[in-house]
Amino acid sequence: MSKRDWLDFEHLVDDEVRDAIKPPSMYKVILVNDDYTPMEFVIDVLQKFFSYDVERATQLMLTVHYEGKAICGVFTAEVAETKVAMVNQYARENEHPLLCTLEKA
């Protein structure tokens, strides 16, 4: 048995099990525009919670501003729920009405 064969575990997975395994459901995390949250705060949120650089964060902030909402990313359910909760909590702590939601992708 070669090293490559030894590392190939594909043969250990039953066909029925392989067919039953499905990728996790994915969810879009969305920022919703409001008339009160400063643009700089939205950029801060996008950098802090979604790891965007300032240029991309600014582009997304403008999408939120002009189109009413923007997708910040697509994640598994647990990650999406955590990001939504963290953004909403951060907004409240800073006394901004910014709303972050999720929807199935």
From Swiss-Prot:
GO biological process: protein catabolic process; proteolysis
InterPro entries per the UniProt record, alphabetical: ClpS, ClpS_core, Ribosomal_bL12_C/ClpS-like
Domain of life, source organism: Bacteria
Alphabetical list of Gene3D superfamilies matching this protein: 3.30.1390.10
Record's subunit section: Binds to the N-terminal domain of the chaperone ClpA.
NCBIfam families: PRK00033.1-3, PRK00033.1-5
Family affiliation: Belongs to the ClpS family.
Known function: Involved in the modulation of the specificity of the ClpAP-mediated ATP-dependent protein degradation.
Protein name: ATP-dependent Clp protease adapter protein ClpS
Organism: Klebsiella pneumoniae subsp. pneumoniae (strain ATCC 700721 / MGH 78578)
Gene assigned in the entry: clpS
